[in-house]
């Protein structure tokens, strides 16, 4: 599938799990999870 999020960012392709868990490469770069931001 082409619609992968953070495709190969951690050495393996992430799908919707990246979106939901905030583990997607794009998620971390553009919008870091608040729980990791210190909230």
Swiss-Prot record:
GO terms for cellular component: extracellular region. It is found in: Secreted. InterPro entries: Natr_peptide, Natr_peptide_CS, Natriuretic_peptide_brain. GO terms for biological process: regulation of blood pressure; vasodilation. Disulfide bonds join 9-25. Expressed by the venom gland. One of its GO terms (molecular function) is toxin activity. PROSITE patterns: NATRIURETIC_PEPTIDE. Keywords: Disulfide bond, Hypotensive agent, Secreted, Toxin, Vasoactive, Vasodilator. Belongs to the natriuretic peptide family. Has a high stability. Is highly resistant to proteolytic degradation, due to its extended C-terminal tail. A high percentage (72%) of this protein is still present in human plasma after 24 hours, in contrast to human atrial natriuretic peptide (ANNP), which has a half-life of less than 3 hours. In addition, it is highly resistant to the metalloproteinase and serine proteases tested, in comparison with ANNP. Snake venom natriuretic peptide that exhibits vasoactive and hypotensive activity. Produces a near complete relaxation in pre-contracted aortae by activating the natriuretic peptide receptor 1 (NPR1). Stimulates cGMP production through the natriuretic peptide receptor 1 (NPR1) with high potencies for the rat NPR1 (EC(50)=100 nM), and very weak potencies over human NPR1 (28% activation at 10 uM). In vivo, reduces both systolic and diastolic blood pressure with no effect on heart rate, when intravenously injected in conscious rabbits. This is Natriuretic peptide TNPc. It comes from Oxyuranus microlepidotus (Inland taipan).
């Amino acid at each position: 599938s082409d619609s992968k999020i953070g495709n190969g960012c951690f050495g393996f392709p992430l799908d919707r799990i990246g979106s939901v868990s905030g583990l997607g490469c794009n998620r971390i770069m553009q919008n870091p999870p608040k729980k990791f931001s210190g909230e």
